[in-house]
Amino acid sequence: MPHSKLDDLPNAVDRWPMIGSAGYRTVKWGDMEVGLTTCEALDATELYKHGGLPGGVCPCPHYGYIFQGRIRAHYPNTDWPDEVAETGEAYFFPAGHVLIYEEPTRALELNPAHALQMCMDAMNRAIEKRLAAAEPAEEAKAGS
């Protein structure tokens, strides 16, 4: 059976480049993905929306534990109240949420790999769109 120390999980900066080289470590075991996220404060609302996720929400349920920090799960277009998990707490956020890392956070997550891949792909599409939109503006600025 697979096992690993958290800091020995493979670096996956290519999967989530916006949080930096040490910010995301992950490995797929069977149909689950084990990930260690270390990030600054981050609101994923625009990433989910501009990345093309249906309804602008994450399709992946997240099971995790927060070593440090605070994560808010917001459930747009529902009557569900926001949920907050913070240092020392285990959590479950069902699909249909937007994650907001309210402060620097270090969290372990166990997620269904396919659903997480859809979320990661959408965030990367949003980043690519943002960068592509910035390039013409930079060129116009340089040409003036």
For each feature predicted by the language model, list its residue ranges.
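A short, N-terminal "cap"/entry segment at the start of jelly-roll beta-barrel domains
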Residues: 1-47, 54-55, 83, 132-144
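Residue-level recognition of conserved beta-strand positions in structured domain cores
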Residues: 38, 75-77, 95, 101-103, ...
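A short, polar/proline- and glycine-enriched secondary-structure boundary/capping micro-motif
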Residues: 46-49, 83-86, 118-122
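Short, conserved beta-strand element in jelly-roll/cupin
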Residues: 56-73
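Structural motif
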Residues: 63, 70, 96-98, 104-106
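Short acidic-glycine-tyrosine-enriched beta hairpin
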Residues: 77-96
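Double-stranded beta-helix
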Residues: 100-144
